[in-house]
Amino acid sequence: VYGLKPSYGIVPLEGHYFPGTDGADIPLSVTGPLARTAEDLALAINLTSDIALQGAPSRSLKDYRLLVITETDLAIVDDEIAQAVESIAAQCENAGATVSRSSDLLPELAGLHSQYLHMLLTVLAVRDPTSDYPLPDLPGWCDMLDQQARARRQYRALFEQFDAILCPNAGTTAFPHTPVPMNDRKLVVNGEEQEFGKQFGWVSIATYPGLPAVSAPIGADSEGLPIGLQIITDFHADHTAVELGRLIGALGNG
């Protein structure tokens, strides 16, 4: 199954608003399609987007410049997932793509993640009468929006040198459902227990600056659970992410 988290604001959120609201877009929130193929993702985003998106720049892997991230200080990644992403990177490189594993243009992810969490918790607290999270005043909220805009501009500079970021969707494959509250949940990754919330480190890379991200299947772990690749592109370059998902899917790993 393929999925697209579209660029922020391009797909209407009607039917997805918080109860009691009258239609204001929800910061950080998007809605996007799921599909069996990347081709169907492309069709779905064209049908649902409020703007006319540009097509992908190329239909050949040899024309793409890729930045690969398989580890950060924010979240531990299962070795099988990291190996699967590295295998895809190697196959892309063999197909002629330019592959890098570091760049001075990559924003400082830990700092942006902290800003993301502050914005996320603020948005959640606004409509939660039981929340004790401290809400910002108006100048404070404007500062948060300025920080987010700066993050998007930082990524815009990165995407002048790269067409996409390849990284894990999450640090683990699917785990058992549990009624344990999110703040108390734990995950075991490579034998090491960590807080569930730290996995949001992979979510925030695309979500905080409002960038599009495709989730593409790239195989399975030793227990047969699917491994997903996250393909992140520049703002409004949704079709580039989708096309890369198609090209990577054609390598035969999904």
Spans of features found by a protein language model:
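Amidase signature
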Residues: 43-198, 208, 236, 247-253
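Structural helix-boundary/capping segments
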Residues: 1-72, 86-95, 207-254
